[in-house]
Amino acid sequence: MFLDRDGVLIQDKHHLCDPDNVELCPGAQLLLEQAHQQGWPVVVITNQSGIARGYFDWDAYERVNDRLLELLGSAASVAAIYGNGHGPEAQPISWRKPSPAMLLAAAEDLNLNLRQSLLIGDRLSDLEAGARANLPLLAHVLSGHGQRERPAVEQWAGECAHSTSDNPGFELVLLESLLNFQPNLLGMQA
């Protein structure tokens, strides 16, 4: 299970660099606890352009991650966190989503089967990364930037479904929040 960090697991606060400002999104802890109980590895993938822009450094990024893990608790295990510190101008050679590079690296590092994985994100770029990594299930959540990006996500999914040259082979699930996620989508028992 791949999840974006800001706007999915934690409240999106523009260029968050202070661990005292980290707040979990509703349903984040429960979802990760359910995944852990069922043996599903959880990988966080996150774009952090604030590093490239000089708003914060890798140490501040790590402190925010540490606070996230502390708030989630031991019952909500995270296998790894992959972060990209490039800005939008770094495309297409960076790990920055929509590149699938972070997902592909995690699959190799952790021996994950991407065809048995899903991604939950709040931005179109999250879902594009999942599609480019050939994940079969993508979920878009309205938290974070999700409300603003939902129309673009729906348009993109429609275009992918009707494409003859690049049929994505994924299912898109639209969620209001992580509280609406149904573990049976993964074969998980809640």
What are these regions (language model features)?
Residues 8, 51, 55, 122, ...:
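Gly/Ser/Thr-rich helix-start
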Residues 1-43:
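Active-site neighborhood of HAD-like aspartate-dependent phosphohydrolases
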Residues 18-25, 57-62, 96:
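Flexible, glycine- and charge-enriched loops at secondary-structure boundaries
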Residues 28, 32-65, 76-90, 130:
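Substrate-recognition element of Asp-dependent hydrolases with the DxDx(T/V) motif
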Residues 5-7, 85, 142:
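Short, small-residue-rich loop/turn micro-motifs
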Residues 9-12, 47-49, 82-84, 105-107:
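A short alpha-helix capping/helix-coil boundary motif
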Residues 59-79, 87-119, 123-190:
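Asp-based, Mg2+/Mn2+-dependent phosphohydrolase catalytic module
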Residues 14-20, 52-53, 90-91:
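Surface-exposed cleft-lining segments at the edges of enzyme active sites
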